[in-house]
Amino acid sequence: METKRLILRKFAQRDLFDFFEYASQSDVGINAGWKPHVKISESFEILKNFIASDEILGIEEKASHKLIGSVGLHLDERFRRGIASRELGYVLNHDYWGHGYMSEAVSAVLYVGFVNMHLEIITCGHYPKNDRSRKVIEKNGFKYEGLIRHHSRLYTGEIMDLCQYSITRKEYIQKK
């Protein structure tokens, strides 16, 4: 799948070094809820799962052909049972923050979710201090549902709340 500046595609083994580059950035992993990778072998193990998955796509910058992040629609049956729903997740190399890349990728993935997959609702969340993620979510038409208190425990031991959002197919179509 292509956008103006990006190619959203399956992960491949050639992505290992670019993946490790952003997975090892301390300000990237913490915002996604995982410990930054210290060894490339950690990234290799995760990359094998990404390659096998149909839920996650690599984000490649067209101009440089560099893998700069990932985006995906993940199964999430914790909150909505019997509803065609997915949870949006994404991560971006911090060198590419602030240029609209993630909003561009999310917009393309929402189209796939609602038009191709016929989803009824897509959810997304961010930790309260992650203002950049909030902006991506709101720019793409998600509505704030509320705060999920004590949502998860980080690798540091810190207990995190989660700001929860969603967008329905109807809202998506009206926005377009």
Question: Predicted segments — roles?
Answer:
Residues 1-27, 56, 60-176:
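Acyl-donor (CoA/ACP) binding surface of acyl/acetyltransferases
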Residues 27-48:
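Conserved GNAT-fold acetyl-CoA-binding loop/helix
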Residues 47-58:
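A short helix-loop-beta-strand connector motif used in the catalytic cores of GNAT acetyltransferases and
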